[in-house]
């Protein structure tokens, strides 16, 4: 498998075409961003850590019956994935109140949200990733009712799995972001990445952040935080879920 043309450069990844038209080459970089890209820095080993965490979780979710784009990880910063037409939506799952949800609704931080909340945001840096409700999604033809039904069902299953997975290693999954795409046969798959860049994680004993909030809020070096998450996931495997 060889990469060919650079197709896309994102905030923390580069995506290349390959010599297989149905397969993409995803390269994780060391760049960290926050505040819609206004804050940027190069973080040592971040690409390797995000690739390792994403690979581990994609493999586990695939084994649990969740359709994903994951195929292989040939080196420390590369993931080989199925080519998918991405839905232009970010799916945010909130298990506990945090971030702007707290200020928007004037609720206590870390209040448990039961049932968990699903939110949809239009994926557009230019527009600031605005919130979208289902009616807007359908009216703008960004996804079909059947696709959104599948997204909701898969997201519930993924949330159940990940919540239990992190709880087993002493971490609370506060909220997180998912992205989906469709393969050429129409199959909806979980795509993008699964890492502390997109998760809000809190240590159950200390209350410390174990995610990109450490960088966003200048709380200290980010690399040891991601190393801690990976170490815990590796030490206690999926059999404990």
UniProtKB/Swiss-Prot annotation:
<dbReference type="InterPro" id="IPR050089">
    <property type="entry name" value="SAICAR_synthetase"/>
</dbReference>
<dbReference type="GO" id="GO:0004639">
    <property type="term" value="F:phosphoribosylaminoimidazolesuccinocarboxamide synthase activity"/>
</dbReference>
<dbReference type="InterPro" id="IPR033934">
    <property type="entry name" value="SAICAR_synt_PurC"/>
</dbReference>
<keyword id="KW-0658">Purine biosynthesis</keyword>
<comment type="pathway">
    <text>Purine metabolism; IMP biosynthesis via de novo pathway; 5-amino-1-(5-phospho-D-ribosyl)imidazole-4-carboxamide from 5-amino-1-(5-phospho-D-ribosyl)imidazole-4-carboxylate: step 1/2.</text>
</comment>
<protein>
    <recommendedName>
        <fullName>Phosphoribosylaminoimidazole-succinocarboxamide synthase</fullName>
        <ecNumber>6.3.2.6</ecNumber>
    </recommendedName>
</protein>
<dbReference type="Pfam" id="PF01259">
    <property type="entry name" value="SAICAR_synt"/>
</dbReference>
<keyword id="KW-0067">ATP-binding</keyword>
<dbReference type="InterPro" id="IPR028923">
    <property type="entry name" value="SAICAR_synt/ADE2_N"/>
</dbReference>
<dbReference type="GO" id="GO:0006189">
    <property type="term" value="P:'de novo' IMP biosynthetic process"/>
</dbReference>
<comment type="similarity">
    <text>Belongs to the SAICAR synthetase family.</text>
</comment>
<dbReference type="InterPro" id="IPR001636">
    <property type="entry name" value="SAICAR_synth"/>
</dbReference>
<dbReference type="GO" id="GO:0009236">
    <property type="term" value="P:cobalamin biosynthetic process"/>
</dbReference>
<keyword id="KW-0547">Nucleotide-binding</keyword>
<dbReference type="GO" id="GO:0005524">
    <property type="term" value="F:ATP binding"/>
</dbReference>
<keyword id="KW-0436">Ligase</keyword>
């Amino acid at each position: 498998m060889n990469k060919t043309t650079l197709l896309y450069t994102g905030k923390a990844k580069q995506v290349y075409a390959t010599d297989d038209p149905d397969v993409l080459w995803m390269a994780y970089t060391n760049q960290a961003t926050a505040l819609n890209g206004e804050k940027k820095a190069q973080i040592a080993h971040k690409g390797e850590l995000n690739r390792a965490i994403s690979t581990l979780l994609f493999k586990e979710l695939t084994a649990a019956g969740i359709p994903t784009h994951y195929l292989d990880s040939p080196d420390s910063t590369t993931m080989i994935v199925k080519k998918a037409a991405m839905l232009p939506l970010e799916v945010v799952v909130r298990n506990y109140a945090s971030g702007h949800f707290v200020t928007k609704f004037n609720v206590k931080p870390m209040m448990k949200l039961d049932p968990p909340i699903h939110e949809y945001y239009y994926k557009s840096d230019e527009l600031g990733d605005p919130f979208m409700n289902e009616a807007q999604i359908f009216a703008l033809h960004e996804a079909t009712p059947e696709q959104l039904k599948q997204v909701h069902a898969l997201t519930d299953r993924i949330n159940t799995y990940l919540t239990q997975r992190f709880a087993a290693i002493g971490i609370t999954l506060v909220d997180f972001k998912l992205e989906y795409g469709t393969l050429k046969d129409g199959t909806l798959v979980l795509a993008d990445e699964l890492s502390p860049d997109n998760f809000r994680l809190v240590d159950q004993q200390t209350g410390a952040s174990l995610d990109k909030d450490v960088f966003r809020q200048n709380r200290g070096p980010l690399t040891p935080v991601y190393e801690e998450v990976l170490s815990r996931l590796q030490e206690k495997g999926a059999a404990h879920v």
